[in-house]
Amino acid sequence: MATRTTLTWEEFLAAGEEWQRWEWVDGRIEFMSSVSLQHGHFLALLIGCLGSFCRAHSEWVAFGSNAVFTMSSGNWRMPDVSLVRRARFPGGAMPTKADFAPDVAFEIHSPSDSPGQIQRKRKDYQQNGVVQVWFDLEKRLVELVYPDRPLQYFEEYQPLVIDTLPDFSLDLKELYSA
């Protein structure tokens, strides 16, 4: 699709087929490739963990990879999984898309993502104050990026702790070994 500066929500929804995923980035539609079975399995396990966290902490809401969030740049991003404070939804009603960035974005590195695409996504998240969690399935490594702190790395034998999430601890060894 040609580069455009604006796109209506309806045009965005009609940009691809139902089975496809895409984002609006820098004035153009970027289609996302299918993922490996390993990626899909890891994603399902991660969603289960975050769902359990949200059931225990009702002030948080988890979203899967089809939820669309609006960045201050105007880009529409779809993290693999995301967490949002429930208080950010006025009156508790959830809109079709969020006119804000998530509080926490979980991303699984995909071999088809170019370094430039990853950097642009990281920049969008950084500029919007999003806590970023990047999983590298091959290296069994996690990068935790706070908007205001140095990058932190977690190896599979360490629990992932995100201090902005109360009582959150993710057993990486269990997650990577499943």
Q: Language-model segments: which ranges?
A:
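Gly/Pro/Ser/Thr-rich low-complexity, intrinsically disordered segments predominantly at protein N-termini
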Residues: M1-A178
